[in-house]
């Protein structure tokens, strides 16, 4: 039996404490990584980010001067040097594996050495309000397309094409799913509980949305009504338009929820309406931070008809910056919770110093 290191003992104690507590709703921990080859310009660039719910808490960039996993949330800064050493070691090992895999995959697809190619990877786990394991996932993509994913049973794989079937056979022979399942159901959950406790003032808060409606004339016959929700957390929110009480799903323009840059989120939904019929339309807002859903209606006497191009442009620019920062990893992420997957990396079975991202050390394709 392996000797339990102090760090592991602390982790288990914090996990036991977490089981006596409850949180509102489910929570998740996810890691995303992206490797981009740069033929003729050195080693591939590797970026990894970790999220608890909608909050980024760690980041690594192989082009950064520090060459270390770095904190991105105040509550993670309390972790000691051993934690950061292990996280850095793990993420660098993953970068090295990706360098090898880029060459292997290029061979699988019979591609030349001239072009740039991309590997993307996502894995993580969810816990319920009682802190117990709900689900785990892992997905891999190559050049922006699905490659292989762990199935919901955490015991089998789905390969996207013939090349991915080669990887599937390798991983099945190595019992990779079993090792990954042990990580997802064990270490991943334990660290997520620890993070939720240490960062509870941030991670378990609810900021209700600030809402308003704007009116944008298109012509003498039509106008756009845009329903805004700003400054809310967590990111999950529902905006719906109704006309005379009937949902207008097909006619609604809805943008993705976007980070505001201050730890909160923004979203809007718009609908084109006949001029003079604005009062027949209502916007309905549902969010965890609201005691009950909000209903908004255009009131021309109290809300000016002013184009808000500056705000829209700012949101678009912010979205572009965020996307660039993670090299499109979040763009590839599944938008539907029932299609979740995750990225496999071999979980250590007895390494008492392993970090929360131990599975970034990937099994080669």
UniProtKB/Swiss-Prot annotation:
Residues in Ig-like C1-type domain copies: 209-295
Gene3D superfamilies tied to this protein: Immunoglobulins (2.60.40.10), MHC class I-like antigen recognition-like (3.30.500.10)
SMART domains xref list: IGc1
Topology in membrane: Single-pass type I membrane protein
Membrane topology (Cytoplasmic): 333-365
Modified residues (Phosphoserine): 343, 345, 349, 352, 356, 359
Chain segments carrying region Alpha-1: 25-114
CDD domains found in the cross-reference section: IgC1_MHC_Ia_HLA-B (cd21026)
Keyword terms: Disulfide bond, Glycoprotein, Immunity, Membrane, MHC I, Phosphoprotein, Signal, Transmembrane, Transmembrane helix
Membrane-spanning ranges: 309-332
Renumbered residue ranges of the record's region Disordered: 338-365
GO CC, one annotated term: ER to Golgi transport vesicle membrane
Residue positions the entry lists as glycosylated: 110
Skewed-composition ranges (Low complexity): 342-359
Alphabetical list of InterPro entries matching this protein: Ig-like_dom, Ig-like_dom_sf, Ig-like_fold, Ig/MHC_CS, Ig_C1-set, MHC_class-I_related, MHC_I-like_Ag-recog, MHC_I-like_Ag-recog_sf
Highest taxon in the source lineage: Eukaryota
Extracellular-side positions: 25-308
Subunit structure: Heterodimer of an alpha chain and a beta chain (beta-2-microglobulin).
PANTHER family (alphabetical): HLA CLASS I HISTOCOMPATIBILITY ANTIGEN, A ALPHA CHAIN, MHC CLASS I-RELATED
Family listed: Belongs to the MHC class I family.
Task performed by this protein: Involved in the presentation of foreign antigens to the immune system.
UniProt-recorded name of the protein: Patr class I histocompatibility antigen, A-126 alpha chain
Organism: Pan troglodytes
